[in-house]
Amino acid sequence: MQRVGSSLPSGSQSASQCPSVAFTERNQVATLPVQRLTEDAAAVRDNVHTEDGFQMKLYAHGFTPEELLVQVNSGCLVVTGQRQLEGCNPDGTGFRVAQKVHQQMSLPPDLDPAAMTCCLTPSGQLCVRGQCRALPPSEAQTGPASRFRSRGSKKLA
């Protein structure tokens, strides 16, 4: 199991059920592993905010999973990547190309960081997905929708 480095005592870390993600109790930082896919997934289409989950797509063509760092930090998703290509032209002159990528965005407050996944498609699409936590039974029954319905059914005198 990988653990995210922390200056907290070892008793302050809790292991996640996801074998490659660990969180510290105080600052909630997690590094997500980037899985390389062998084919483009049909599910990787657009950035999506849904009621039960989250998906973000980023163009990262040319990067390998090892060159990308995907982290969840205090309710934000942060993706960074850096790579360098060096070579020599036929005329003997050298070249160096540096490429960087950086994307940061806020995550839904009820998103479960331990259930997030990250994959890189052959076409260079980095896709990060996550599911929202289930509401406790008491909140699910008395959620905002049920409260609004009960108010709307009252008759005014």
From Swiss-Prot:
<dbReference type="InterPro" id="IPR002068">
    <property type="entry name" value="A-crystallin/Hsp20_dom"/>
</dbReference>
<keyword id="KW-0539">Nucleus</keyword>
<keyword id="KW-0346">Stress response</keyword>
<feature type="region of interest" description="Disordered">
    <location>
        <begin position="1"/>
        <end position="20"/>
    </location>
</feature>
<comment type="similarity">
    <text>Belongs to the small heat shock protein (HSP20) family.</text>
</comment>
<dbReference type="GO" id="GO:0005654">
    <property type="term" value="C:nucleoplasm"/>
</dbReference>
<dbReference type="GO" id="GO:0005634">
    <property type="term" value="C:nucleus"/>
</dbReference>
<feature type="region of interest" description="Disordered">
    <location>
        <begin position="136"/>
        <end position="157"/>
    </location>
</feature>
<dbReference type="GO" id="GO:0005829">
    <property type="term" value="C:cytosol"/>
</dbReference>
<dbReference type="InterPro" id="IPR042940">
    <property type="entry name" value="HSPB9"/>
</dbReference>
<feature type="domain" description="sHSP">
    <location>
        <begin position="35"/>
        <end position="148"/>
    </location>
</feature>
<feature type="compositionally biased region" description="Low complexity">
    <location>
        <begin position="1"/>
        <end position="17"/>
    </location>
</feature>
<feature type="compositionally biased region" description="Basic residues">
    <location>
        <begin position="148"/>
        <end position="157"/>
    </location>
</feature>
<dbReference type="InterPro" id="IPR008978">
    <property type="entry name" value="HSP20-like_chaperone"/>
</dbReference>
<dbReference type="GO" id="GO:0005737">
    <property type="term" value="C:cytoplasm"/>
</dbReference>
<dbReference type="Pfam" id="PF00011">
    <property type="entry name" value="HSP20"/>
</dbReference>
<keyword id="KW-0963">Cytoplasm</keyword>
<protein>
    <recommendedName>
        <fullName>Heat shock protein beta-9</fullName>
    </recommendedName>
</protein>
